[in-house]
Amino acid sequence: YLVSPAAYAALGAYMFLLILVGFPVNFLTLYVTLDHKKLRTPLNYILLNLAVADLFMVLGGFTTTMYTSMHGYFVLGRLGCNLEGFFATLGGEIALWSLVVLAIERWIVVCKPISNFRFTEDHAIMGLAFSWVMALTCAVPPLVGWSRYIPEGMQCSCGVDYYTRAEGFNTESFVLYMFTVHFLIPLSVIFFCYGRLLCAVKEAAAAQQESETTQRAEKEVSRMVVLMVIGFLVCWLPYASVAWWIFCNQGSEFGPIFMTLPAFFAKTSAIYNPLIYICMNKQFRHCMI
């Protein structure tokens, strides 16, 4: 054991709690949306994509971590580490790029930079495909030799190698690529879209250009998506910051808990998206009841 057995027991219990909550709420989101035709709107396709991403994390990552924490180390070998790291990375990246698509959709619908544009089913499918392609370009390279997945923190889960300069894996270039293309760029797009969105909402309210009902509906959707972005930042920013610090300070001493806490805090992202969606979408709640 790298730390006390009680810490591994607490970790296992935490993962069990995430599975207990994460699987039902994400499955419920999928089931209710697919079962009710009026919920099958283009925007909801992207929200469904978030639920699928969260289920990847729950089934492919959380179950593995709970099992390994019961043993005190990663018992599933190289293949298990690759699978767990891949599913956790894929789920997190699909969620991030889905939020990018949602931000762009909100910007185009509310700010109207393209006149007479309507977000259709085809646009939603293109957005889904884009989020998957971008997520795969982040999750697949460590499986084929550009960087690698290794056990991290308390050695019960696997992630991208930020820790070493292992020969033959080009870990440095991959970390720089990942932080630039799969973290800074998407966040910049999200912040740009919501910056413009807030300005447009204020201007529309001042000019009373649209009916009060339309304005209220757009505001509710925008508020829901903004909350999802804030939730993503709260969950993933500590992990990204610690990973970057470790990458920039290789050779420095730090305990296993240092990386474990932000890594497992990030995993709560599989719960907050469906809960925000369920709590803030009246139509969904009516269909669910």
UniProtKB/Swiss-Prot annotation:
Lineage summary: Eukaryota, Metazoa, Chordata, Craniata, Vertebrata
Keyword Transmembrane helix: yes
Record topological domains on the Extracellular side: 1-7, 68-81, 145-173, 246-257
Cytoplasmic-side segments: 33-44, 105-123, 196-223, 280-289
Transmembrane segments: 8-32, 45-67, 82-104, 124-144, 174-195, 224-245, 258-279
Subcellular location(s) of the protein: Membrane; Cell projection, Cilium, Photoreceptor outer segment
Membership in a protein family: Belongs to the G-protein coupled receptor 1 family. Opsin subfamily.
Alphabetized GO MF terms: 11-cis retinal binding; G protein-coupled photoreceptor activity
One GO term (biological process): visual perception
Keywords assigned by UniProt, alphabetized: Cell projection, Chromophore, Disulfide bond, G-protein coupled receptor, Lipoprotein, Membrane, Palmitate, Phosphoprotein, Photoreceptor protein, Receptor, Retinal protein, Sensory transduction, Transducer, Transmembrane, Transmembrane helix, Vision
Membrane topology, from the record: Multi-pass membrane protein
UniProt keyword Phosphoprotein present: yes
Chain span(s) of sequence motif 'Ionic lock' involved in activated form stabilization: 105-107
PANTHER family linked to this entry: OPSIN
Entry comment on modification after translation: Phosphorylated on some or all of the serine and threonine residues present in the C-terminal region. Contains one covalently linked retinal chromophore.
Organism: Procottus jeittelesii (Red sculpin)
Modified sites of kind N6-(retinylidene)lysine: 267
InterPro entries the UniProt entry points to: GPCR_opsins (IPR050125), GPCR_Rhodpsn (IPR000276), GPCR_Rhodpsn_7TM (IPR017452), Opsin (IPR001760), Retinal_BS (IPR027430), Rhodopsin (IPR000732)
An annotated GO cellular component: photoreceptor disc membrane
Purpose of the protein: Photoreceptor required for image-forming vision at low light intensity. While most salt water fish species use retinal as chromophore, most freshwater fish use 3-dehydroretinal, or a mixture of retinal and 3-dehydroretinal. Light-induced isomerization of 11-cis to all-trans retinal triggers a conformational change that activates signaling via G-proteins. Subsequent receptor phosphorylation mediates displacement of the bound G-protein alpha subunit by arrestin and terminates signaling.
Protein name (database record): Rhodopsin
